[in-house]
Amino acid sequence: MRSNILDYLNSQTFTNFSTSSELPWDASGVPLYLKNMKKMYVDRPQTVQEPLIDTLDDNGIVNETISVTVYVSADAKTLPTDYETMLSTVKAARLQDLTTGWRQRATSVATSFEGDILVTEFTFNFTKLI
């Protein structure tokens, strides 16, 4: 799923933002997106399986959710002119053909501040029955 989102982001044209294929942290755990503002980083997918219907023969129905997080930062005092466009474009990644076959595709966006840096975090949740 990470590669699907990376492919989508790489296919988009942004004026002030770019995409990195690196993971969001360096070897010591320092967030790269704080060092390299206006560069999007896609984290590894996280998978959760929740049983919906358990059966005695272990052939139940399970809800599998894969979550992928994208991080990007910018100077909070002077946001790039295409910041809002970037938000809309990244959120639309869940709707692309790259993510077909999923029963539910959701995106949440959260922002936080690290000093004068605005950190935007997109969390994509893709859910299917298995």
Regions found by a protein language model. Give the residues of each.
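Acidic-leaning, charged glycine-interspersed low-complexity segments
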Residues: 16, 38, 44, 85-130
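Small/polar-rich, solvent-exposed N-terminal microdomains that initiate assembly or binding
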Residues: 1-56, 78-88, 114
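Oligomerization/assembly interface segments of phage tail-like spikes and tubes
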Residues: 58-76, 117-128
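Well-ordered, non-transmembrane segments within structured domains
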Residues: 69, 74, 78, 86, ...
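Compositionally biased, intrinsically disordered low-complexity segments enriched
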Residues: 48-51, 66, 106, 123
